[in-house]
Amino acid sequence: MRTTYCGLVSEMLLGQTVTLMGWAHRRRDHGGVIFIDLRDREGLVQVVCDPDRAEMFKAAEGVRNEFCLKIVGKVRARPAGTENANLVSGKVELLCHELEVLNPSVTPPFQLDDDNLSETTRLTHRVLDLRRPAMQKNLILRYRVAMEVRKFLDANGFIDIETPMLTKSTPEGARDYLVPSRVNEGMFFALPQSPQLFKQLLMVSGFDRYYQITKCFRDEDLRADRQPEFTQIDIETSFLDEEEIRGMFEGMIRTVFRAVMNVELPGYPVMKYAEAMHRFGSDKPDLRVKMEFTELTEVMKDVDFKVFSAPAQAKGGRVVALRVPGGGEMSRSEIDGYTEFVKIYGAKGLAWIKVNDASKGREGLQSPIVKNLHDAAIAEIIARSGARNGDLLFFGADKAKVVNDAIGALRVKIGHSDFGKSGGLFEDKWAPLWVVDFPMFEHDEEGDRWAAVHNPFTAPKDGHEDLMDTDPGKCIAKAYDMVLNGWELGGGSVRIHRAEVQSKVFSALKIGPDEAQLKFGFLLDALQYGAPPHGGLAFGLDRLVTLMTKADSIRDVIAFPKTQRAQDLLTHAPSPVDEKQLRELHIRLRNPAAGQSGV
């Protein structure tokens, strides 16, 4: 039986005989003495195999990388000058007495300490990739985060209750993953995008504090921080108001950081959605980046430069400047690179001005656009932006959404660049905040209708109920997002607990009474039985752990993730199924050839 882990062998065990089990990370033959670095989930220990024990030494000679081994030996101090300060076991080594090969290994397709592996190679050989110390560290930290979350919620009276995985398809924003029913021909289940409705029903049922750490599913285009299946820390509580809910779960995240990383998070500023969009063009601003927008829409309405004046005069248009302190030293090729970057977000281009001498007005500026701006506009740009000599101003002028997306992304990109970090535009710290007072609705131009910003079950601010009938665009929601370093870590809201208010929201969304009853009748019925005031939120566990580990991708903190094409390169899912299975499910493929190709 194993007596300890490799990575836990330390000076505390000097002189003791221990039994270890793990994998040969590296084997070295030094003049008749064989050294084996034995590895397990806790780390490495150096094993010394002397030729004095012939049978053991012969077995050691046959060991290769990734052989699974059992080793019995005595812990001793390493010779002076050979210590390794990077390891817990770095001051000791194990003198091998017995060595047993539990299972040999074929030659691995890569070295586990190769840091230049492609993600395709890593995901194809995920079993081996997960043996890498960095991956094991990530997943162990993930476990510790989940454990601390459970401890906190249990201590605060929350009950872990499971909700169904096979449920009803309801409009929640993204596409559902559908599961055909064999028993009920032509009918489909949906995999849950969130347990939203069930947790509200649990509040009506009297379980006033609920949580679960559960899988959710969304069939949407993937990005670096998205997966088709993801893990959510889902929470709901009755009888607490918005401020109390925020306070409790800010405390939870503080507890997790303190317990897992020994980090004390700073205070959480509370910022209204409108302010976040005005200053940063984003509802999840990265406060580590020390640049903000300068609003110029009114200033640009009367300039003789259509690139600025047209969006400034248009309904829903916006013109802003982004001051980059010290940016005057940027080369034209760097500026051109940023111009191409903003086009990804729909911008047509990127106007700029270099400030050589702010005191000289027009004469102290360098830019192809200066000639198109009158003196008053130039003076306003300099004054409002606070531009100084050596600064660079970038401009966004378009529909507000395009400006916010493009210049908001530019702000983050410059801040995170080598230029930004060396120029003091980025502060490496933990920067949390709450964003509150989101709009209740946003207008869908294509469908010419209102859509819920969060979900249709979010309560409006007190006194805003009537705006749903008269002016939905001005209706503010009791919604809140926790943002950390530019990532939405979690989001939630106070929910609607009165059936008549819920019906009003459905009406604003052009969901008629019959459709509402068909899709949400079970909720409307439940709300009539004394539903308590309630609210909650959900945190993305994958995102939280990605931030805490500073991983390059969310896929580095998930044991068996999907690619950006929603494929599993290890198991080759999704995969074709045979005709018999399709017949049982009453399914016929429109394009049978499409179902024949694997990953």
From Swiss-Prot:
A Gene Ontology BP annotation from the UniProt entry: aspartyl-tRNA aminoacylation
Gene3D superfamilies per UniProt: Bira Bifunctional Protein, Domain 2, GAD-like domain, Nucleic acid-binding proteins
Location of the region described as Aspartate in the Swiss-Prot/TrEMBL record: 196-199
Residues holding ATP: 218-220, 227, 488, 540-543
Residue(s) at site: Important for tRNA non-discrimination: 30, 81
Membrane-crossing residue ranges in chain numbering: none
Family note: Belongs to the class-II aminoacyl-tRNA synthetase family. Type 1 subfamily.
Assembly mode: Homodimer.
Name of the protein in question: Aspartate--tRNA(Asp/Asn) ligase
Origin species: Methylibium petroleiphilum (strain ATCC BAA-1232 / LMG 22953 / PM1)
Source species taxonomy: Bacteria, Pseudomonadati, Pseudomonadota, Betaproteobacteria, Burkholderiales
Gene: aspS
